[in-house]
């Protein structure tokens, strides 16, 4: 993929910056990543064997499609600090690309956009991206029902810890901690007993 990117840059097909290279290589990977329906079908089929088989497949796909950029993740800094309260895992995430000056200038000239509404909305799946919103043509999400509501599972592209996944509502709604939130967390554990799950505090 790096060779293709270098060729694209040298032949004027892509600007030479992290943002534009990411947009370009994600478009390429989107063409060879299996369709969402195929990914969901394979996931569900493997889930019948075991939930872990299903998530193993999905996590590997998320890496092989370059949605999770392994070559960047390996640069993250991680260590354990001993404290009087116990060991604390500390991570410094270096895999999230920094904006370059060209991309910042281009973003300032763009009309404001509200699609997708945020980086987690289901509409990100397959989204072509722009200089101020990452491309997601290689992104696939897994539907599930929690507490009677439609949710999706995805892995974080920035991997703060092993198999770092995110569960999000099918609708763009504020996060809320209440009884139903705990019911949904427990539903998730029943579906994926090899994982643990938590929830952020109430956030807008």
Kindly label every feature range from the protein language model.
Residues 1-174:
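Active-site microenvironments that recognize anionic phosphate/pyrophosphate groups
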Residues 119-125, 183-185, 198-199:
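Short C-terminal domain-edge/linker segments immediately following a structured domain
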Residues 135-138, 182, 200-201:
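Short acidic (Asp/Glu) patches
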Residues 146, 203-204:
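A broadly tuned preference for mixed-charge, low-complexity surface segments
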Residues 170-195:
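Helical scaffold of the NTase/Pol beta-like nucleotidyltransferase catalytic core
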Residues 195-203:
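A short glycine-rich, hydrophobically flanked beta-strand micro-motif that places a catalytic Asp/Glu
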